[in-house]
């Protein structure tokens, strides 16, 4: 007698069985109550395991190979159910898959068919490594030249670590911002369109999968975000009544909006670095574990996240004092238009209290900025960036803050909001903010411009550091709205129509410590650059960290139009010594300007800079010095500006360098908060003084028994010479005499084949210029 379960099997249709590898899709139009798709299998309990729900029978026809033993007395083994691994392979490979709506998902071992309408991501490869919180992603649907589709991209994480977000598709182009968590981020991009079949089915068929690995770059100094308020500030910002009713204008809202704008700076800058083949490097923020604000769902769900920290700092001034018309930068008659920067600098310095030599990079939002309609100007606002010493600072007002997005879901609506600017309540800044989306451009973009100054960027001929941020929206949306600024109706905007950082800004960022990423070689401690005129009109440029690029300025030019890069390309070698000639440099200039005075700014790989005000003069005979023995020597380029009142040139050719029996035994340094002078003492009790005797005196003795002599100097300088140290042939280096942390550091070491024979420079109340004299 057959076992009882075989009787049950005989009552069942063959159609209720499937082979283990069956992927038949012929029954997609029939009723399906079968095993859920892979997307369903990965939704339970936070694990990507198999659902424990029993599998109902399929009503479709399948292979009967497993039914061959039904009439035998020995029952065959039942087919095993296909398993799905915990880390499903389909999430670890890029590409598009069809959801095959109406059927359970196929086995992992089969080849999945591709949808021609699956999103094609153009700027991020699968398994890419990035170093920021928010990543800009763009791509196309099918071939935009053949079919212009409208629709929506939905981006979701496999692990549901962040809510799904929707992004519009315009004429088959899309731009997306992805919020990343540390580690692997397995993402699904689903495209839906009313013009395509299966658009409303629960299992999307036009999907692409992408894995992005994010590593927080903790080995670089962060960009600090600060909301600065007056001591009696209520913590509110300008906004129209309707928007206040909808989202309020509280300090909490200001923090959310400022944080999201900073994420946009980061995403934009990282993408610009990548497009310029400089890697996905970008600045980072200090973070804190706090209530999530990246998604509008975070508050309702009580989600906690590691978000960019926004420091709230109150300054010593009242709101009325901050809004004084004499402090307003937009007031042409203001008596103290730069004081808001000084007030912010003082408050930030007191808050962070940096240690000597510790740099802090701080971008400040002036919350109490206010549109004063009666005077037709913004008070309490300054757009400035720069700083020195321990604090590098950018400041900008909150006059456009109400137009900023608060969450990632609000980015496209914010840059598509055509609501006219109501100047009864908020400012039309520079008359370029006639609508809400244009106000967001000006506010977010101009603040990023000042942050560029914070990182050392000057104004440029194009890009963010000119004023190209008026089109910042184009980096985040594919369709631009009507512009009150240009009176244009807008339309599709692609990557080549976006604003950008200038190439020179990005080269500065590459060398900046705030842009360091994991895997970088250790930062070179000496970032200095030197220039040495030598024989035959050649100027030898040296930098121990390597020479990165040279900016060239013609007489009368404030902005750089011409530059030369070094060490670019996969097989290039970092050059630490480079010969420059005037004909070679001028050949790179416009033919009608080749006789103009040429100024150079030479940048090192480690971020140092050296200025040559007149290259032709440096390369000429004017840089030669005839020594007492008849030999010619050469003056290096000089540190310090030699612009103090009463500054006079000074020069010393060392007796020990031209008269062999004379032995240099000691060097005396005269110093206080700066260098006053240097005295060279010889064995025969004679001395040579460069500068003045003043302040304290410190001695440095040379070991004459071992033949020790001076090989170079290390100095700290800016406007004048802050401090000086000696380097010797035995590898010794003295202390820095003077202000050891003032200005920036420079190493004066003759190039190969040359030796130090003297010093020169200029002296006023103290030394305000210093260079060395070298000879073969």
Go through the PLM ranges and name each one.
Residues 162-163, 172-182, 193-392, 399, ...:
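Propeptide-to-catalytic entry region of secreted or membrane-anchored zinc metalloproteases
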């Amino acid at each position: 007698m057959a076992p009882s379960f075989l009787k049950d099997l005989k009552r069942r249709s063959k159609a209720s069985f499937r082979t283990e590898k069956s992927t038949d899709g012929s029954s997609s139009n029939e009723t399906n109550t079968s095993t859920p798709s892979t997307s369903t299998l990965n939704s339970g309990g936070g694990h990507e395991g198999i659902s424990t729900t029993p599998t109902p029978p399929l009503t479709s026809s399948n292979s009967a190979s497993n039914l061959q033993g039904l009439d035998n007395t020995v029952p065959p083994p039942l087919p095993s159910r296909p398993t799905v691994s915990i880390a499903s392979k389909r999430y670890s490979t890029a590409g598009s898959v069809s959801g095959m709506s109406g059927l359970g998902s196929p086995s992992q071992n089969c080849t999945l068919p591709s949808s021609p309408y699956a999103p094609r991501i153009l700027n991020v490869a699968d398994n890419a490594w990035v170093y920021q919180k928010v990543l800009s992603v763009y791509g196309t649907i099918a071939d935009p030249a053949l079919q212009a589709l409208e629709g929506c991209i939905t981006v979701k994480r496999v692990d549901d670590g962040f809510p799904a977000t929707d992004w519009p598709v315009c004429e088959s182009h899309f731009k997306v911002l992805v919020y990343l968590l540390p580690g692997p981020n397995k993402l699904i991009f689903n495209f839906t369109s009313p013009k395509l079949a299966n658009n409303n089915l629960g299992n999307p068929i036009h999907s692409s999968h992408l894995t992005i690995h994010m590593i927080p770059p903790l080995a670089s100094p962060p960009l600090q975000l600060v909301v600065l308020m007056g001591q009696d500030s209520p913590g509110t910002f300008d906004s129209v009544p309707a928007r206040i009713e909808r989202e309020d204008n509280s300090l909490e809202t200001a923090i959310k909006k400022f944080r999201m704008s900073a994420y946009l700076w980061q995403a934009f800058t990282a993408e610009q670095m990548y497009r310029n083949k400089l890697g996905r490097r970008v600045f980072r923020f200090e973070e804190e574990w706090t209530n999530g604000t990246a998604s509008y769902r975070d508050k309702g769900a009580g989600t906690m996240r590691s978000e960019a920290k926004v420091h709230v700092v109150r300054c010593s001034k009242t709101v009325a004092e901050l809004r004084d018309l004499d402090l307003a930068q937009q007031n042409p008659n203001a008596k103290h238009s730069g004081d808001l920067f000084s007030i912010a600098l003082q408050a930030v310095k007191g808050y962070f209290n940096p240690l000597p030599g510790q740099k802090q990079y701080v971008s400040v939002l002036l919350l109490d900025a206010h549109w004063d309609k009666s005077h037709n100007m913004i008070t309490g606002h300054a757009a400035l960036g720069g700083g020195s010493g321990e604090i590098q600072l950018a400041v900008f007002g909150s006059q456009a803050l109400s137009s900023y997005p608060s969450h990632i879901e609000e980015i496209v609506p914010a840059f598509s909001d055509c609501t006219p600017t109501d100047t009864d309540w908020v400012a039309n800044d520079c008359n370029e903010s006639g609508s809400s989306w244009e106000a967001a451009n000006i506010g977010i973009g101009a603040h990023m411009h000042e942050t560029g100054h914070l990182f050392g960027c000057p104004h440029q001929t194009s890009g963010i550091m000119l004023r190209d941020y008026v089109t910042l929206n184009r980096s985040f949306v594919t369709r631009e709205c009507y512009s009150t600024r240009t009176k244009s109706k807008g339309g599709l905007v692609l990557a080549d129509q976006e604003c950008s950082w200038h190439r020179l800004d990005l080269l500065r960022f590459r060398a900046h410590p705030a842009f360091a990423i994991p895997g970088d070689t250790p930062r070179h401690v000496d970032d200095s650059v030197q220039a040495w005129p030598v024989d035959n009109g050649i100027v030898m440029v040296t930098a121990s960290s390597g020479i990165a690029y040279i900016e060239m300025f013609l007489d009368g030019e404030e902005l750089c139009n011409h530059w030369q890069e070094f060490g670019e390309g996969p097989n290039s070698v970092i050059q630490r010594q480079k010969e420059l000639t005037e004909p070679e440099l001028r050949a790179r200039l416009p033919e009608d300007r080749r006789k103009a005075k040429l100024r150079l700014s030479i940048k090192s790989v480690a971020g140092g800079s050296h200025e040559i005000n007149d290259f032709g003069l440096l390369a000429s005979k004017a840089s030669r010095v005839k020594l007492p023995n008849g030999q010619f020597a050469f003056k290096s380029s000089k540190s310090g500006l030699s612009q103090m009142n009463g500054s006079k040139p000074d020069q010393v050719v060392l007796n020990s360098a031209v008269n062999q029996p004379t032995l240099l035994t000691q060097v005396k340094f005269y110093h206080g908060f700066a260098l006053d002078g240097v005295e060279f003492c010889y064995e025969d009790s004679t001395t040579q003084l460069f500068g003045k005797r003043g302040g304290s005196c410190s001695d440095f003795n040379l070991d004459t028994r071992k033949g020790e002599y001076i090989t170079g100097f290390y100095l700290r300088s800016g406007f004048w010479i802050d401090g000086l140290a000696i380097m010797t042939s035995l590898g010794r280096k003295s202390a820095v005499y003077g202000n050891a942390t003032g200005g920036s550091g420079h190493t004066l070491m003759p190039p190969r084949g040359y030796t130090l024979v003297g010093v020169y420079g200029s002296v006023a109340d103290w030394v305000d210029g210093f260079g060395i004299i070298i000879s073969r």
